[in-house]
Amino acid sequence: MSITLEEVLTSLRVVALPMKTKFRGISIRETALFRGDAGWAEFAPFVEYDPRECVPWLESAIEEATTNFDNQYRSTIAVNATVPASDDEVEIEKILSWYPGVDTVKIKVGTGIKEDLIRIARVRKILPSAKIRIDVNGSWKIDDAVFNIRTIYGEVAGNFLEYVEQPVATLDELRELKERLIVDVKIAGDEVLRKASNPFALDLSGAIDVLMLKVAPLGGIKRSLELAAHHKLPVVVSSALESAVGISHGLRLASAIEKLDYACGLATGALFEEDLATLPINNGAMSVNTPVIDDERLERFAATPERLEWWRNRITEVWKLRRRA
């Protein structure tokens, strides 16, 4: 199956989904949807991304619109809770209640070690047996990362600290960090992979222990599976804050990975006031299926005509950068 630019633009819908809590600094998630022979697809690069960085996101959406995938290894995916950079104990407890049955929590950190320790301690107070992941988004310098990871491990997390996601920005920094860390903590790589011009060319040895796979920024399910096979590391499938349409593509990726040892970060739909479809979390897991999009919600959350035109122009510009265009 294939799809043309004209077909994409003809079926294009843009929605603005309000969030229950700020995440990544935003309270409204704007995203574009279009239809192909295989159903709805999502194109959702954040608005600040330049056109070239958006190309793999468009390739993933085209794949979703034109390809039918069967569940290969599992029909349900264990997921983690996600706690934004909030220090309010009541809010943290409320956020965790949106993820029934999860036994793993990903916590955004990097706002300051004092605040980070408080946030992690509050999560552990509410879910004392949960595995903890912290996500730094590459914001620490090496010296800070060494100190902060040792401190977090020693004071609040201990062996419950499953891994630290992208603590520093570059591969060289990640290698140096692993050499200097005294505590036995795994390091996961996210931005270092998905922001690389050629992620297949990266030498990840001695730099990371876990590979984060985000289906849209990596160009789709097929390319993500190829990357996982190439780098031969344990993987976690995670979201890029998509609606249920994009999340379902991530769930299909997770179902296609033979060995999946970690809970996946695909439950971020819980952060929306309402999603375009219902993807429930049951006993800490989500089912792999094609969501039924609610037409009423498509209308209710429709973006303004000006924003629709902005996305039309964006898709047209990105389409021209595709290698097959």
Q: Residue ranges of each PLM-predicted region?
A:
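Mid-domain alpha/beta scaffold segments of enzyme catalytic cores
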Residues: 41-89
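Short, charged beta->alpha transition segments
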Residues: 65-68, 81-97, 110, 117-122
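Catalytic domains of carbohydrate-active enzymes, especially glycoside hydrolases
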Residues: 40-43, 95-110
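Flexible C-terminal active-site loop/helix
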Residues: 1-29, 40-45, 64-67, 72, ...
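Catalytic core of soluble alpha/beta enzymes
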Residues: 107-110, 114-249, 254, 273-281
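Short coil/turn connectors at secondary-structure junctions
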Residues: 74-77, 101-102, 128-129, 183-184, ...
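Active-site mouth loops of central-metabolism enzymes
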Residues: 17-24, 76-90, 108-110, 138-142, ...
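Short beta-strand elements
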Residues: 30-35
